[in-house]
Amino acid sequence: MTHSTLPPRPFAILAMRRTGTHYLEELVNEHPNVLSNGELLNTYDTNWPDKERLLLSDRELLERACWRYPPHSDKKVTHVGCKINEPQFQERPSFFAELTAWPGLKVILVIRRNTLESLRSFVQARQTRQWLQFKSDSSAPPPPVMLPFATCEAYFKAADDFHARVVNAFDSSRIRLIEYERLLRDPVPCVATVLDFLGAPALQLADRGILRRQETRPLDQTVRNFHELRVHFANGPYARFFELAND
């Protein structure tokens, strides 16, 4: 990897789990000057061969991410980043403050409009132990799942709280919101928006990604107790998550 004279500009992709951050990272990394290095706080992320890094202080860990990141290619890196999801901040609560204080760091907050889809996807992936789906994989879709009322409510609240926390912690010039649904529908212009926000040179990406969406069926076919949940959350702040296209 070739380093430019100036240190790369740092960024972080923040999100709840199962919001398309792997896909976004795959597309962003098509740019010859941008490198996103996976989940910094994930012990098992293969982008980071040294698990001992998690023993570092918060500041040392961010220095590792921004200045001493692992080489992946011969890219001339001008923008370097990583991903962090909401549960990882729970496991390392002091890290959020260090992130907000890091000079020049920009944040891409990825939001899935329907948080129930995010939870359903997480439970499916956990049960099947299949966290990614490749375009070459023709396996059957994952089985439907049961979602307890309390689990849904806690997850919905956690998502609302996390999104508000991130938005309130960063100046508007340092944060950009990306919707999962738009990323799937229009990946090329969506990534162009991200690159422009980071200040990376414009580039027409080819969307040669190898990942694909694991589940495309509607919620009433993938959540066994969907209708019971719909009744339970009717007329409340989360009723919108249970709307179907044919309603």
Swiss-Prot record:
<keyword id="KW-0614">Plasmid</keyword>
<comment type="function">
    <text>Required for the formation of sulfated nod factor. Proposed to transfer activated sulfate (PAPS) to a N-acetylglucosamine of the nod factor.</text>
</comment>
<dbReference type="InterPro" id="IPR052796">
    <property type="entry name" value="Nod_factor_sulfotransferase"/>
</dbReference>
<protein>
    <recommendedName>
        <fullName>Nodulation protein H</fullName>
        <ecNumber>2.8.2.-</ecNumber>
    </recommendedName>
</protein>
<dbReference type="Pfam" id="PF13469">
    <property type="entry name" value="Sulfotransfer_3"/>
</dbReference>
<feature type="region of interest" description="Hydrophobic">
    <location>
        <begin position="1"/>
        <end position="16"/>
    </location>
</feature>
<keyword id="KW-0536">Nodulation</keyword>
<keyword id="KW-0808">Transferase</keyword>
<dbReference type="GO" id="GO:0016740">
    <property type="term" value="F:transferase activity"/>
</dbReference>
<dbReference type="InterPro" id="IPR027417">
    <property type="entry name" value="P-loop_NTPase"/>
</dbReference>
